[in-house]
């Protein structure tokens, strides 16, 4: 109890003194501000997507949280993931459908604030009209497996 109160007191003091916006007190406590996320290309997705891994890594059997940023007019062909993924739309509109081939007429438009829970090995596809940011979390190892191997950008 004392260590919890001491950590809370330290947190409040640092917050009042203008401590950096992103920091971790321990392995179980972390805060991340959007402007301090580090974005990188995503080799398993078509060019243009960016990822910021907040918790992970995605390749291990541990909890993961990541943000993905997609440009306007972006498409991801039909693919599936080996684990359940919880998707929250942070901004923009995330158009998602299930099936073996991308068909924009068979999607549901999820606006900011929406949630999708993708079951393992369920083929699905996505596209955007405008820049869209989603947050994905689950327990790894995660990955992207394309229904049509020719769609996999890692093989091009």
How would you label these PLM feature ranges?
Residues 1-5:
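Positively charged n-region of N-terminal signal peptides that target proteins for export
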Residues 22-64, 149-156:
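A short, N-terminal "cap"/entry segment at the start of jelly-roll beta-barrel domains
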Residues 28-31, 105, 125-156:
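Double-stranded beta-helix
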Residues 59, 94, 100-121:
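Short acidic-glycine-tyrosine-enriched beta hairpin
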Residues 61-81, 110, 119-120:
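Conserved short histidine dyad/triad with adjacent acidic residue
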Residues 71-74, 80-101:
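Glycine- and acidic-residue-biased ligand/ion/polar-headgroup-sensing regions
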Residues 76-78, 96-97, 118, 123-129:
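Short beta-strand His + acidic residue motifs that chelate non-heme Fe in jelly-roll/DSBH
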């Amino acid at each position: 109890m004392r260590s919890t109160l001491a950590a809370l007191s330290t947190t409040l003091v640092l917050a009042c003194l203008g401590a950096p916006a992103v920091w971790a007190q321990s392995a179980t406590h972390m805060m991340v501000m959007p402007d301090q996320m580090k974005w990188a290309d995503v080799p398993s997705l078509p060019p243009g997507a960016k990822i910021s891994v907040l918790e992970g890594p995605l390749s291990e059997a541990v909890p993961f949280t990541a943000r993905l940023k997609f440009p306007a007019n972006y498409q991801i062909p039909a693919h599936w993931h080996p684990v359940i993924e919880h998707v929250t739309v942070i901004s923009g509109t995330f158009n998602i459908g299930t099936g073996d081939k991308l068909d924009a007429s068979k999607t549901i438009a999820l606006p900011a604030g929406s949630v999708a829970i993708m079951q393992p090995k369920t083929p699905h596809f996505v596209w955007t009209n405008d820049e869209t940011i989603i947050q994905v979390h689950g327990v790894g190892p995660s990955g992207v497996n394309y229904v049509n191997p020719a769609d996999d950008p890692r093989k091009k």
